[in-house]
Amino acid sequence: RARRAVEKAIHLLEEPDDHYLLFATRLGLIKKTALSEYVRINRNGKYALRFKIEGDSLVNVRSATNEHDIVMISTTGYASRFSCGDIRASGRVSGGVYGIKVGDRKGSGGGIVAGMVAMLSADEYILTISKYGMAKRSRLGTAEKIHDTDASGAPKFEDDGSPKMVTDGYRRTKPGAKGVRTMKLDEEHHDSIISVRTIPDIEDHLFLLTKSGMMIRIRVSQTKETSGKSTRGTRVM
């Protein structure tokens, strides 16, 4: 029997109606199954998904409704945002569909999936942390076009005098897209995103641990909030 390891533990709702489990794999697949299919599990367990691609593995599992926005982020710094309702629900033993292009697929940004988050509020933050200790905090946003402003809050205008418009937060894409750049990485030193988290409260604390066993504790507010998708963020470790 193949060796098994626990990947994720989540709590089940007493009333799972309208809730789903979302499974994200390292090669960019996402699978959505009704949470009710997992309410009764025997001691030997149940198959939750079948991997379509040899060598693929599970990265993350989230509980969500069709009202949630899903964001999948690759290790190379790209983010694919789409509605949970855009993904068709399937049975337990299905393999899912592509949520983001990664690896050597044509038009991809390379890498593998670093993480997946499910979010309800446009004012929640996504925190991305890189292998070499850079962190970036970005607001999810409404994905609508808004009037761009400078650091002082003054509106910006194009050369022809028309308002300069930008996307509020992360732009929505279709499932399976390459996505948009979410964090600029030091490619010369082969930096990559290793952790993706939602931040409901910027006064929360982060505990960062290195492979050598060194741990530091910082407030989320110590990370810099950035609206630009091509910025590196701040060094936290």
Give residue ranges: language-model regions.
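Short, structured "edge-of-domain" segments at secondary-structure transitions
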Residues: 1-237
